[in-house]
């Protein structure tokens, strides 16, 4: 099998978009492929209509694909060379797309004022490490916070952190779980295992624990996983998480994903994405408190990255594509739609205008993680293999498998993919 085909197979196995082909629209036509919630679909439809009105003769075709079928659809379009001018992509897969030659930098195409307005975390999720070019941009970013009930925590005499630097230590976190269990909580914490392995959740939400404890999925200088993912620090991190499950502290996968704010609040804490805030707030009101992720090592580490927009390298009119993205990201109605759904800001101006994330807002501390503790998932072309291997390893570890064996197997799979692709030059330390 050719090297590139092996890469495509790995990406498909990881349920990831692999390639963005060379389909190009005419100068007066733009094609945009995306996935999203109903409010996002409506917002983009409105944007397209108003952009067409502002640019007579231009047609914007929106290719809306359900999230679960997105990668399959994209793969089919790639195989026929019929791909969009503008495409939405999940941030950690950007390195693969750029390495494959399917994206072009957005700098010089999107308004510079928007680029200057990006948060550091937003810049990192759209940047390709070898040339440090910015290849994608979005209005939003993402994070994971630790949610709790202020009344419940105060009643149990568990302190509530007031800054990222003030995050709970590992000892405080595990003591809180024990205390909450003893005080009657059915489950001290929901890690949202109910999301399963068909999403990025395991890598997205749990890799920060490894990073906080001083290890990683892969060495980001040599780009080798063996010796890093199977290091003692990572084994200790995986063993720690396995212990939480064995102690009965974690909501089981079979219980679903809303035990923190369900009736009776079976779960005392929630290790949840920023999107959990809106639903939990509706159920809990002002009793809801958002806290930073714990410091399992020297400092707290949080994730970032979400669905962002890039421009096909082969589009017939890259300037028009850039104009559309600028129009979209500057649009007040578009921003309002995301504000109403607690979109996590990727632009500083969007954050300042958000009552949830602005200074002293209920999620201001979670937003602070974007500049103080956010670390992107490994920006490497082998990421589809990296995330698939880690997801499977952690699933097995949660189910009782030996952490050292599972992490070693995962590291071997990752390094084998990189070796099969000649190191994904210019990556690698050789």
Annotate each language-model stretch with its function:
Residues 30-46, 65-67, 142-143, 196, ...:
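Extracytoplasmic "Venus flytrap"
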Residues 107-121, 162-166, 191-200, 213-236, ...:
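Short, solvent-exposed loop/beta-turn-alpha elements that line the ligand-binding surface or hinge
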Residues 91-145, 202-205, 289-294, 356-359, ...:
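Hinge/lid segment of periplasmic solute-binding proteins
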Residues 35, 202-213, 235-317, 323:
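Extracytoplasmic/periplasmic substrate-binding proteins
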Residues 53, 57, 128-201, 216-251, ...:
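Helix-loop-helix "hinge/cap" segment bordering the ligand-binding cleft or interdomain interface
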Residues 59, 243, 373-430:
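Conserved C-terminal helix/tail region of periplasmic/extracytoplasmic solute-binding proteins
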Residues 276-286, 296-392, 425-430:
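C-terminal lobe and pocket-closing loops
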Residues 29-31, 46, 50-121, 136, ...:
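Extracytoplasmic "Venus flytrap"/periplasmic binding protein-like
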